[in-house]
Amino acid sequence: MVRIFTSILLGLLLLVTGTRSQFQFFEQMFGGGQQQQHDSREQNVPSDSDWYQRTYDNARCSNYLCPGTLACVAVPHHCPCQHPAVEDKFELGDGSAICVSKGGFKFGEAARKVELARKGLL
């Protein structure tokens, strides 16, 4: 009787230990629980419009300060694109400019689409 009880107890202990290890494996595999989420949040830049406003207010520019890049230029349509590696800039005839994603277009295709859109054909 004692031998049967010991066998049952040992079986339950092994079952609980195996289940616990399995849950720890899944916890590590899917983000490590709360600690992992906490770490990833610390790496993100907070949404803080006050930071942008302070940086904008402290920027020194005697001409025009571009709001998107904080570049100091002579006139607004000379503002550079925020992401020049992936955007093309198009100066429009009315003194404004737009930045358009290069998005895999062949050379000149983005400019053609901008012109078609300006004419109302796109």
Curated annotation (Swiss-Prot):
This protein's record includes keyword Chloroplast: no
Keyword annotations from UniProtKB, A to Z: Signal
One GO biological process term: ERAD pathway
Secretion signal, residue range per the UniProt entry: 1-21
InterPro entries: LCL2 (IPR034543)
PANTHER family per the UniProt record, alphabetical: LONG CHRONOLOGICAL LIFESPAN PROTEIN 2
Family named by the database record: Belongs to the LCL2 family.
Role noted for this protein: Probable component of the endoplasmic reticulum-associated degradation (ERAD) pathway.
Descriptive protein name: Long chronological lifespan protein 2
Taxonomic path: Eukaryota, Fungi, Dikarya, Ascomycota, Pezizomycotina
